[in-house]
Amino acid sequence: ALRYPQALACLGAALKAELLRRLGAAGLGHEFVDLGGDGSDPTDDYPDFARRLGHAIRDGVVERGILICGSGVGASVAANKVRGVRAAVCHDTYSARQGVEHDDLNVLTLGARVIGPEPACECALAFLAATFSGEERHLRRLNKVLAIEAEER
């Protein structure tokens, strides 16, 4: 189990509900924090949820999060604007796992219009089960990414 709860924020209400159901049933030992988005408000926009999740990560409320929008791309772009967030769209388990192991990915974004519930759940499980390798080459690259973030903001 991870030290902090996982967060789930999204606009894809049906996919979110299925993820919560399946991830809860998987018995991973994670606590999930719902940061909103049930599809009932037409003024909901993915940047708002991305910022909310990014701040929860930045502030140490959660360790990782999952964002859902139509394609996953917009949510990823918005989340990556928050210092300390490393978000990526992953629609396959290899990328979801490897993103954590090599790049210390802390936000998985999914596209509700692109991926079905079964592969989305498999990606989420791979993302949550993975840990950063800490290998020298991955640390070196991560430190370079963090330096870019510090210099550019």
Task: Label each PLM-derived region with a short phrase.
Residues 21-31:
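Short helix-loop-beta junction
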Residues 29, 61-63, 104:
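Short, high-confidence coil segments that cap the C-terminus of an alpha-helix
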Residues 30-42:
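A short beta-strand-loop structural module common to alpha/beta enzyme folds
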